[in-house]
Curated annotation (Swiss-Prot):
Name of the coding gene: trpB
Name assigned to this protein: Tryptophan synthase beta chain
GO molecular function: tryptophan synthase activity
Organism whose genome encodes this protein: Klebsiella pneumoniae subsp. pneumoniae (strain ATCC 700721 / MGH 78578)
Subunit structure: Tetramer of two alpha and two beta chains.
Reactions the enzyme catalyzes: (1S,2R)-1-C-(indol-3-yl)glycerol 3-phosphate + L-serine = D-glyceraldehyde 3-phosphate + L-tryptophan + H2O
Annotated positions of the N6-(pyridoxal phosphate)lysine modification: 87
Record-linked InterPro entries: Trp_synth_b_CS, Trp_synth_beta, Trp_synth_beta/beta-like, TrpB-like_PALP, TrpB-like_PALP_sf
UniProt superkingdom: Bacteria
Cofactor(s) needed: pyridoxal 5'-phosphate
A Gene Ontology term for the protein's cellular component: cytoplasm
Amino acid sequence: MSTLLNPYFGEFGGMYVPQILMPALRQLEEAFVSAQKDPAFQAEFTDLLKNYAGRPTALTKCRNLTEGTRTTLYLKREDLLHGGAHKTNQVLGQALLAKRMGKTEIIAETGAGQHGVASALASALLGLKCRIYMGAKDVERQSPNVFRMRLMGAEVIPVHSGSATLKDACNEALRDWSGSYEKAHYMLGTAAGPHPFPTIVREFQRMIGEETKAQILEKEGRLPDAVIACVGGGSNAIGMFADFIEETNVGLIGVEPAGHGIESGEHGAPLKHGRVGIYFGMKSPMMQTADGQIEESYSISAGLDFPSVGPQHAFLNSTGRADYVSITDDEALDAFKALSRHEGIIPALESSHALAHALKMMRENPEKEQLLVVNLSGRGDKDIFTVHDILKARGEI
């Protein structure tokens, strides 16, 4: 089947789905391409981002964390967005696309619950019926977000199969969509999955990097030495990276979760420690066994607990344009505490991985003058109970 947009990033990407879903993906691609050229669609999307979601988000300079170093560190404050994370950006775009296609229902999957909350709020706003698949384990560890979704009228469906986490929720959501695509839109939550989702999600998140570029030029008069973002599926990172890819003097650093340590096998770092396979409708690196079964990923942060990664990140990694590193649970926890204590900002555990790498860069080169931007992709309200229990068990509180 020919496509309007290139479905691949190098060798990665594609549309590996049952034949029954091909018409739905084709319809989605056509709607997206026409919407991108439609001034009325763009005006409505921009208006929602500004007057409902609260864009542009701030670029905040850290006053205290950089003490004793020559680093200047800024945070792109996606945590200030309505809904609490960057997820709100692209769901507003997808919800408008769903309406454009005449769909009346939204299907979504969620890990940390942030995409679920965003899907629920966009559905409530635009009058769409919403059902959200969530791994049973994540339902337990993200109870505040589950209640938020239900409060906004969404049906939350716990998934008990497999590892009862995000990958299983993704499978159930796709299964649902294959039987209901005529009236339902699958609102995929990250820059992964079958074409055209990775491209759609990137384009509906790219304002993160566009705003950052304008803001840093205004504040510092130059581009940053590096932009840093956490990577699960990769939507906040590709949103930050997209406008900087051509700026080859700006480093792009994606941070995967090392969990209990790469050597433990309990991590979520497929880019550096997985191998290429087919999963979730795409060809991309993933964590898999010797016989090709998808391995369980692990991270303290539910939103990074995903065994694969978006195909554009795989491409940027393969070409060397972006560097991908990993941060352990403990390092992310330390960054979570440090930002809370020294800047009065409680970050999501996902975003804490990106911050932890920036802090590591500062510590390793205290005399190096460097201008860094971390994408603070979400706020940590949803994680305070998880962190509280860990710190209590350690006797730190």
